[in-house]
């Protein structure tokens, strides 16, 4: 992490996707319309709005995506309630990236992968899974065990059904 991560940058929410009754995925870019900063799989960022508060969220988009960052956020508090009420075009402050991320380029290469997540717990794993999908030749079989209270509570279900299940050696 560089000191640059400590300084807030103004971003814009360009798209909001409702994944479940209480989870939305927010697509964020900088004021210049570009990805705000580089990140590693598994890192997070601080999202804030003056007068509302701030909270740390997993970056769910793959680091190989050069256009934007995404955050899948469950409605469960002051900041998340506010986020769930905004519309595309809303400006927001972003700081990061934070955390070390996962050692995908060193410890994981050439190995079979097992991911286990439930509900919103898939969010921090999503960037890792998509990174591995983007670099498919570097990794072995990928097994994903994912559950939720009901099918309606499966975060990113469309991505799982339409993209991950169709990847070679991806078992969901």
Language-model features: locations:
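Ferredoxin-reductase
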Residues: 2-90, 148-150
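FNR/FR-type flavoprotein reductase catalytic core
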Residues: 4-5, 78-172
């Amino acid at each position: 992490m560089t000191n640059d991560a400590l300084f807030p940058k103004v971003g814009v929410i360009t798209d909001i996707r409702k994944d479940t009754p209480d989870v939305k995925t927010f697509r964020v870019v900088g004021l210049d319309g570009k990805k705000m900063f580089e990140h590693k799989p598994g890192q997070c960022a601080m999202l804030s709005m003056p007068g509302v508060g701030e909270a740390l969220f997993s970056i769910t988009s793959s680091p190989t995506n050069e256009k934007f960052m995404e955050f899948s956020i469950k409605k469960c508090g002051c900041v998340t309630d506010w986020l769930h009420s905004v519309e595309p075009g809303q400006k927001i402050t972003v700081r990061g990236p934070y955390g070390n991320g996962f050692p995908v380029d060193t410890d994981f290469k050439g190995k079979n992968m097992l991911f286990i997540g439930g509900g919103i717990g898939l969010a921090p794993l999503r960037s890792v899974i998509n990174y591995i999908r983007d670099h498919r030749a570097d990794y072995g079989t990928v097994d994903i065990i994912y559950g939720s209270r009901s099918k309606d509570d499966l975060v990113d279900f469309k991505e799982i059904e339409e993209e991950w299940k169709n990847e070679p050696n991806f078992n969901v």
